[in-house]
């Protein structure tokens, strides 16, 4: 073994000893994540884009994409529940379903039935529920609306045409 190999092995051994020493006796401690996204960050970067994409998918009758975006929207709300336990003393996991679950079910039914009219109505109801949640939580200045255009110029929302 050359000097460099011995130094590397010695350094690795040193790190293992330090890590083992610092972890010993702390097995039951849960180490918090280094980064936890804030509520506004999740809403702006996850919920809102999928809310928009869900609408665009439905407008173009791209039902597979609409179902995918609905699932992504559900995941985004689950992230809110996971990372933000409470908001102004209210438990988010208990509060959100009252504003979302019914509308998610109605939208999913419209998507599976490929019913554009039902989809538009359900999407409008979901959007209204978003605003009702904001109002109930002293955030009435955040008003969500049905998108008038797509901010996603790099994504096609029309279904793929097959021959």
Q: Model-predicted segments: where are they?
A:
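Short helix-adjacent coil turns
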Residues: 60-62, 111-118
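Bacterial N-terminal signal peptides
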Residues: 9-18
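Solenoid-repeat scaffolds in large eukaryotic assemblies
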Residues: 65-66, 73, 119
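The canonical Cys-X-X-Cys-His
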Residues: 126-137
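Immediate post-signal-peptide N-terminus of mature secreted/exported proteins
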Residues: 23-67, 157-163
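Short, solvent-exposed, charged loop/turn and helix-capping segments
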Residues: 76-95
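Bacterial N-terminal signal peptides that target proteins for export
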Residues: 1-10
């Amino acid at each position: 073994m050359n000097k460099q190999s011995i130094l590397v092995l010695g350094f690795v051994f040193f790190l293992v000893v330090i890590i083992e020493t610092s972890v010993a006796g702390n097995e039951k401690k849960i180490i918090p994540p280094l980064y936890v996204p804030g509520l506004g960050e999740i809403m702006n970067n996850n919920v809102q884009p999928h809310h928009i994409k869900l609408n665009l998918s439905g407008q173009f009758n791209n039902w597979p994409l609409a179902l995918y975006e609905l699932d992504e929207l559900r995941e985004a709300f689950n992230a809110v529940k996971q990372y933000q336990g409470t908001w102004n003393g209210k438990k988010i996991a208990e509060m959100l379903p009252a504003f979302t679950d019914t509308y998610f079910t109605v939208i999913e039914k419209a998507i599976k039935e490929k019913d554009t009219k039902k989809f538009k109505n359900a999407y409008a109801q979901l959007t209204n529920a978003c605003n009702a949640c904001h109002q109930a939580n002293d955030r009435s200045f955040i008003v969500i609306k049905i998108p008038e255009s797509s901010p996603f110029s790099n994504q096609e929302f029309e279904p793929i045409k097959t021959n």
